[in-house]
Amino acid sequence: MAAYLVFTKEREHDAGAMKEYSAKAGASTAGHAAKPLAYYGAIETLEGPEAQASVILEFPTMEEARAWYQSDAYQEARALRFQGGDYRVFLTQGV
């Protein structure tokens, strides 16, 4: 069953770190079945705290999503995201 990793950027602190994160995070998907469904496009917050941006990645299963998220390559990129901004990240199963 499909699974979705959703990233919501709440605040950016360091544009340089975010640029480097974006490049490394993109490269980290090599060998993983990640399909981008939304990638920093126009966003409109309808409820809750204001969001600046979002990314939605589709994976075939929750296990495959976790495997990418926990991979060494993504964890290296993730450290840059922590420097660059405040995000909320969650994994949800599709129907």
Protein language model regions, located:
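C-terminal structural segments of small proteins and small subunits
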Residues: M62-F90
